[in-house]
């Protein structure tokens, strides 16, 4: 019975696609115009390739539930960076869950033709959050079918957008200026602030490493899945990016519902069977995103709590199956509070972009959690050279430093341009300040909780 629930290689590859490929992040990137193609290719080479190799080495050398927390903690055991990374990694999840919950009422409006009031919106958002939370109470191997279906749907949606873009161009031509200069990298604040979304679109390989106990042969399956899944993901991103960029005027792309807008503009319909089917499939992928990430995030938080680096509630496990329900419940509560605040903000300021505000805040916190992984990789090579490494990043010391520090620098730069307002005009401040203030509050709360937990753990 247990053997039947083990992941096959195909399951692991589809899990990589389900975790890493994020359909809802395509629209913000497409909004920067044709320069997105330069950034996609550049980030594939400068970030995806080294990050994928480093994750493969660390994930196959140090298997277990701890994920990136375990790697950082092993590399720097006397510092708080493991605890900080686990906090940043965890807090990103309820923020992300809230940002996706905000999209659900709009998708249901497309499906049903109904317009929801604020109370109905809140109920829909809470239903999404607590459905995901309930599913997180069970092992990820019990959700193989959901993950596989979600991965398949994501690929279908991306290919559909790409094909529709080609059809639109054949019939009507390109809607955006396709001059060579438009493909050069944009260095304006608008473009640079979305680079973090491209990096986010490549994150998540370490989540699959926390599935090791559910795999038949993790030391072989993890690197195989990361390589094959990474190639598929890169190709799908480029194809779907072309579809959106070719058929939709850049200024008309919505950050909140870009995929649905893309299909509507390409087909010339805002409703109907086809658009409704796309909305339904997109909704299913949102559940797939949350379910696939919940295992990695909750396991990492529980592992850190058991080591005394996170609040004790995160260490609570369900006696029935040993799942980290404390972390899952806390995520559900925090996401619910964020959605309630979002409803209040929407009532006070109807034009606010809640999805992007919540999504950008989660981006900052998630990227912060990854920054220490790269120096941890170098440190573990130095202090633990004798551990068996089923997959080993090729190259000498100099090359390894380049492979580690370039993606780390890209992460830090993208955090800066996402969270720090570089202009004091009212429009810039209204867009950036919620992200800046939210990031500072999240960091400060984390420091307080980590310090309090450390005192209790050592007393």
What feature does the model see in each segment?
Residues 1-42, 48-53, 64, 74, ...:
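Membrane-interface "cap" regions at the ends of multi-pass membrane proteins
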Residues 3, 313-322, 367-420:
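C-terminal membrane-solvent junction of multi-pass transporters and transport-like membrane proteins
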Residues 3, 35-38, 115, 120, ...:
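Helix-loop-helix junctions that connect adjacent transmembrane segments
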Residues 5-16, 38, 78-92, 124-128, ...:
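Select transmembrane alpha-helical segments in multipass membrane proteins
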Residues 30-31, 50-129, 134-137, 283-300, ...:
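Hydrophobic transmembrane alpha-helices that form the core helical bundles
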Residues 40, 168-169, 357, 361-369, ...:
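A generic transmembrane alpha-helix motif of multi-pass inner-membrane proteins
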Residues 70-78, 110-114, 225-291, 310-362:
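TM-loop-TM module centered on a large, flexible mid-protein loop between adjacent transmembrane helices
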Residues 119-172, 203, 226-230, 363-372, ...:
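Membrane-interface loop-to-helix entry segments
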């Amino acid at each position: 019975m247990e053997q039947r629930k083990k992941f096959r290689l195909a399951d692991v590859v589809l899990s990589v696609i389900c975790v890493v490929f994020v359909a809802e992040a395509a629209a913000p990137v497409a909004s920067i115009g044709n320069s997105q193609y330069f950034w996609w290719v550049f980030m594939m080479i400068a970030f995806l390739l080294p990050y994928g190799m480093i994750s493969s080495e660390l994930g196959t050398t140090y298997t277990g539930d701890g994920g990136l927390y375990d790697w950082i903690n092993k590399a720097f055991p006397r510092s708080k960076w493991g605890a900080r990374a686990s906090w940043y990694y965890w807090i990103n999840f309820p923020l992300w869950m809230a940002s996706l919950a905000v999209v659900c009422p709009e998708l249901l409006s497309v499906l049903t033709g109904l317009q929801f009031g604020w109370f109905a919106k809140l109920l829909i958002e809470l239903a999404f959050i607590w459905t995901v939370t309930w599913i997180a109470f069970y092992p990820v191997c019990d959700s193989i079918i959901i993950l596989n279906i979600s991965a398949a749907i994501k690929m279908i949606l991306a290919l559909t957008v790409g094909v529709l873009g080609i059809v639109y161009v054949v019939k009507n031509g390109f809607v955006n200026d396709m001059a060579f200069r438009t493909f050069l990298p944009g260095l304006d604040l608008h473009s640079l602030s979305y680079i973090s979304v491209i990096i986010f679109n490549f994150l998540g390989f370490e989540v699959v490493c926390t599935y090791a106990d559910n795999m038949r042969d993790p030391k072989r399956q993890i690197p195989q899945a990361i390589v094959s899944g990474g190639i598929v993901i890169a190709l799908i991103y480029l194809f779907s990016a072309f579809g959106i960029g070719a058929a939709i005027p850049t200024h008309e792309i919505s950050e909140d519902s870009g995929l649905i807008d893309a299909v509507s503009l390409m087909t010339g319909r805002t409703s109907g069977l086809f658009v409704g089917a796309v909305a339904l499939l997109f909704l299913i992928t949102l559940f797939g995103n949350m379910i696939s990430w919940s295992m990695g995030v909750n396991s990492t938080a529980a592992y850190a709590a058991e080591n005394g680096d996170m609040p004790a509630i995160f260490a609570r496990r369900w006696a029935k199956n040993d799942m980290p329900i404390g972390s899952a419940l806390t995520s559900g509560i925090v996401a619910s509070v964020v959605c309630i605040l979002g409803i209040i903000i929407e009532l006070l300021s109807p034009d606010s972009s809640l999805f992007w505000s919540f999504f950008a805040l989660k981006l900052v916190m998630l990227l912060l959690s990854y920054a220490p992984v790269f120096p941890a990789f170098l440190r573990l090579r130095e202090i633990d050279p004798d551990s068996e490494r089923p997959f080993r990043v090729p190259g000498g010391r100099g090359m390894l430093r380049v492979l580690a520090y370039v993606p780390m620098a890209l992460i830090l730069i993208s955090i800066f341009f996402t969270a720090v307002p570089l202009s004091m005009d009212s429009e810039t401040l209204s867009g950036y300040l919620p992200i800046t203030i939210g990031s500072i509050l999240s960091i400060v709360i984390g420091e307080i909780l980590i310090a309090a937990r450390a005192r209790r753990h050592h007393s």
